[in-house]
Amino acid sequence: MFPVELDNVTVAYHKKPVLQDISLQVPEGKLIGIIGPNGAGKSTLIKTILGLVPRASGDISIYGKDYKDQRTRIGYVPQRGSVDWDFPTSPLDVVLMGRYGRIGLLKRPKKADVEMAKAALTKVGMHDYAKRQISQLSGGQQQRVFLARALCQNADIYFMDEPFAGVDAATERAIMTLLAELKEKGKTVLVVHHDLQTAEDYFDWILLLHLRKIAFGPTENVFTIENLQKTYGGRLTFLKDKVLAEGHKE
């Protein structure tokens, strides 16, 4: 039984396919990068798995069941730009939202939930900012808060939509440390990622996506010049650098 399984999933906006015939069996305990050009359907794929975007056809299962039956096993970090950061709330309150899937929306968090939220903020270096207004934080700090919320969900599968976008180098390192720790705990982590320069170092599995699945598997097998050309059309300077680098290895 796979953490995530897709069988011939197609998604269309206004009858135009944006994802077509996607079939995947996501292995457990892997750190997986979802990579492709702008408009390739990377964020749409995550949102479709989470039931946020309807699919035109195909089947999706989480540990063999429907997403609705497995919500407590899933953590989600959306794109930072999709969040209303002017909403009057504190980092601690945001992180506590990660507990509501388990305690229920209408129940007050218990002391143990609050302590877990504080521990998650400490984990991402944001304990001292717990009571500030979320709008007063920098982009990197806001992203750390969302990561802390995901930690508080204590999930088995984590979906992260461009967690490195617009963050400073220190925050990027902190995020990668956190992702590595989740993997060590046997968690399955799927990350939408844009930076091809870091992809080989960051992920042990990669999904190359451009409306269709181009390739999916261990990074050393998938992240090849041929597959990148299929995904990006050979337009990237990175491909030239990779060709030169691989030429030097021979």
Curated annotation (Swiss-Prot):
Role, per record: Probably part of the ABC transporter complex MntABCD involved in manganese import. Probably responsible for energy coupling to the transport system.
Gene: mntB
GO MF, any single term: ATP hydrolysis activity
Protein's UniProt name: Manganese transport system ATP-binding protein MntB
Signal peptide positions on this chain: none
Taxonomic lineage of the native organism: Bacteria, Bacillati, Bacillota, Bacilli, Bacillales
Self-association state and partner proteins as the record states: The complex is probably composed of two ATP-binding proteins (MntB), two transmembrane proteins (MntC and MntD) and a solute-binding protein (MntA).
PANTHER family: IRON TRANSPORT SYSTEM ATP-BINDING PROTEIN HI_0361-RELATED, METAL TRANSPORT SYSTEM ATP-BINDING PROTEIN TM_0124-RELATED
Protein keywords: ATP-binding, Cell membrane, Ion transport, Membrane, Nucleotide-binding, Transport
Segments passing through the bilayer: none
Gene3D superfamilies: P-loop containing nucleotide triphosphate hydrolases
Domain ABC transporter: 4-236
Residues annotated as binding ATP: G36, P37, N38, G39, A40, G41, K42, S43
Family recorded in the similarity comment: Belongs to the ABC transporter superfamily.
Topology in membrane: Peripheral membrane protein
Compartments in which it is found: Cell membrane
Major place of residence: membrane
GO annotation (BP), single: monoatomic ion transport
Pfam families for this protein: ABC_tran
Organism: Bacillus subtilis (strain 168)
GO cellular component: ATP-binding cassette (ABC) transporter complex
Induction: Repressed by MntR in the presence of manganese.
